């Protein structure tokens, strides 16, 4: 007997394949914008396993693009209302569901302050997608296990 998590991990290659077939137009749009208006700094906002995937994204971005990337504590934006100067910078949000209010509110506030916002979300038509300027769907399919296994692997794939 295999667990749901193992089943989803074993099927994650389908999500990566699906991304290769569908993600290019959205990636090209984001890449074009970043080339026209390159940020000096990028931020990530995420929770749980998505935050771990965001760390991988940050590592790749720093190594390949050369701009610093920091994980932003969402409470600094939402609860403490810190006057962050983010105009012209980029924020990348990562989520399986795109439903977390603190994640959505962080992106909404950072975008209002002038940050380019990109959401990598598995669930389409989510509040996080609506709050972001750009949306990169993960195409992982429905999640059955608690750990969002396919979405985690799909985020790693989309980040690369």
Predicted regions and their residues:
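Glycine-rich phosphate-binding loops that contact phosphosugars or nucleotide phosphates
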Residues: 37-160
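Cofactor-/ligand-binding subdomain signature composed of acidic, glycine-rich
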Residues: 1-38, 147, 153-157
């Amino acid at each position: 007997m295999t667990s749901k998590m193992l089943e989803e991990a074993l099927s994650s290659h389908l999500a990566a394949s699906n991304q290769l077939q569908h993600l290019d137009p959205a990636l090209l749009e984001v890449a074009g914008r970043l080339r026209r208006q390159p940020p000096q700094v990028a931020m990530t906002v995420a929770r749980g396993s998505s935050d771990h995937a965001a760390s991988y994204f940050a590592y790749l971005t720093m190594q390949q693009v050369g701009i610093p990337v920091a994980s932003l504590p969402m409470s600094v934006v939402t609860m403490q209302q810190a006057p962050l100067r983010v105009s012209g910078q980029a924020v990348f949000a990562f989520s399986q569901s795109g439903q977390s209010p603190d994640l959505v509110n962080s992106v909404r506030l950072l975008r209002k302050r002038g940050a380019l916002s990109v959401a990598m979300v598995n669930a389409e038509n989510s509040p996080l997608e609506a709050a972001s300027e750009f949306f990169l769907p993960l195409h992982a399919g429905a999640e059955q296990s608690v750990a969002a296994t396919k979405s985690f692997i799909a985020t790693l794939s989309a980040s690369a």
